[in-house]
Amino acid sequence: MDMANLTWLHGQPQSTGVLKANPEDFVVVEDLGFEPDGEGEHVLVNIRKNGCNTQFVADYLARFAGIHARSVSYAGLKDRHAVTEQWFCLHLPGKETPDFTQFSLEGCEVLASARHLRKMRIGTLKGNAFTLVLRHISDRQDVEPRLQAIATGGVPNYFGSQRFGRGGNNLVMARRWANDEIRVKERSKRSFYLSASRSALFNLIASRRLANQQQHTVLEGDALQLSGRGSWFVAKPEELEALQQRLDAGELMITAPLPGDGEPGTAGEALSFEQQCLLEQPELMALLKRERVDPARRALLLQPKNMHWEWWDDATVELRFWLPAGSFATSVVREIMRQDSSDADISE
């Protein structure tokens, strides 16, 4: 998916710059949101890795512990070309905890380990703390007010380009699958292609909403979330004024759909708007319905927390912030500057 065609919240950046001149410029630390239980048949292992992708480390951990690869899980994928502190979960019923002082893998260091009662699954994560270094910035005078605007007003909650695969290949394959040009039997590929389809449709609708300058306006029938919560409710006509006040106060968030086969969660004006957008992508919608993908909702805007920055010089800034799981750091960077390296990304 071409991220360049999506609407900006703070206008198109004028400055250019470089993200990830080296892996140390992109540091991600997982925030579990809980402490390990200290007992149980699972072992949580926190590993700092540089130059290794998530699945490669998971497979190595399985061999190290003498267990099947399926017995190692994690909360989400992390980019290879970055420094990441990530938790892995080893299922070791009736087995001793491995001696992680003997763990040796180039680019990796075990930081901590502890027993836990429950398996770590995809999404078992509160969020991620990021430290990014943006280099070769061409216009500090354009970037500085953008940083201030993002700290207070957030960014569009777009899925980053990594969701769509290298060169957007996951979306290309999803379209071919939708048109019956290929058969997709492998479970992981089916998941990737369906996820790319939903993400592309979310980005489309979110972008249209921003283009209409309605990102801060409650529409009749909107699906609204309590800030920081997953459930939503529909805005009724007689409640619009009160709901608008709550949105303005930061209590509520407008959502956009992750479409699927089922009720979209909106009504009235909001439903009509979303359906009109989805008419532009009939292939992807047909695929999601055919594969019985459950619909969901996602916040339209993303507010980085604990955001602060330090200019090292007029062309280099270090940026720190926290994002909830499932959000993309490059959706923040995209509002700051134009840059070529868009794959150093994921916060899932």
From Swiss-Prot:
Known catalytic reactions = uridine(13) in tRNA = pseudouridine(13) in tRNA
In the Enzyme Commission scheme, what number(s) does this protein have? 5.4.99.27
Where in the numbering of this chain does the TRUD domain appear? 154-302
Q: Which residues form a coiled coil?
A: none
GO molecular function list: RNA binding; tRNA pseudouridine(13) synthase activity
Q: Where is substrate bound in this sequence?
A: 26, 128, 328
What is the active site of this protein? 79 (nucleophile)
The alphabetized UniProt keywords are: Isomerase, tRNA processing
Q: Which Pfam families match?
A: TruD
Q: Which GO terms describe its biological process?
A: tRNA pseudouridine synthesis
- Broadest EC class? isomerase
- For this chain, the annotated S-S bridges are none
InterPro entries linked: PsdUridine_synth_cat_dom_sf, PsdUridine_synth_TruD, PsdUridine_synth_TruD_CS, PsdUridine_synth_TruD_insert, TruD_catalytic, TruD_insert_sf, TruD_pseudoU_synthase
Give an example GO cellular component term for this record: cytosol
Function, as annotated, reads: Responsible for synthesis of pseudouridine from uracil-13 in transfer RNAs.
Q: Which family does it belong to?
A: Belongs to the pseudouridine synthase TruD family.
Protein's recorded name:
tRNA pseudouridine synthase D
Organism of origin is Serratia proteamaculans (strain 568)
